[in-house]
A protein has these predicted regions:
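Hot-dog-fold acyl-thioester-processing enzymes
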Residues: 2-61, 117-140
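Short aromatic/hydrophobic contact patches that present stacked aromatics
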Residues: 11, 65, 111
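Hydrophobic beta-strand-centered segment that forms part of the acyl-chain substrate-binding groove
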Residues: 40-86, 106-107
């Protein structure tokens, strides 16, 4: 069983591509950051502007592991899926899948950490934790 999945789409832009006309691999990490930012601003109700500028907190990436499965090309429409694999005291494990035209292109796991003004990990605030919980994959 699984929890909710956050899904969004984005078209591959010219700036995303290398001279071979395929997505330059570091651009996927920028795209993932955008997906996380959209997830926070949307269903989690806490935009990065609010977190960073008003609350003085952030959610940096502590770890990421990626698998490049098939190339994506200019003007491909990509579908991004995000699910939560683990919700710790201050950390959150994410699973990302990128597909286009029914073909898996990229997948990654990522760990983000809730960090306070001191730049040290702090527990997720309960209201935010409660909004993350529905995205948690249920383990059998």
């Amino acid at each position: 069983m699984s929890g909710q999945t956050f899904t969004t789409t984005r078209r591959v832009r010219f700036a995303d591509c290398d001279a071979a006309g395929i997505v330059f691999f570091p651009r996927y990490f920028e795209m993932l950051n955008g997906v996380v930012e959209d997830w926070f601003a949307g269903p989690l109700g806490a935009s990065f502007r609010e977190l960073h500028m008003e609350r003085g907190v952030s959610v940096p990436t502590a770890a990421v592991e990626a698998r490049f499965i098939a190339p994506s090309r200019l003007e491909d429409d990509l579908t991004f899926s995000l699910a939560v694999t683990k919700l710790g005291g201050a950390s959150c494990g994410l699973r990302h899948v990128i597909e286009s035209a029914g073909q898996r292109r990229f997948e990654a796991t990522q760990t983000i950490v809730y960090v306070g003004r001191s730049l040290k990990p702090e527990p997720w605030p309960e209201p935010l934790r409660a909004r993350i919980r529905p995205f948690l994959e249920i383990q059998p």
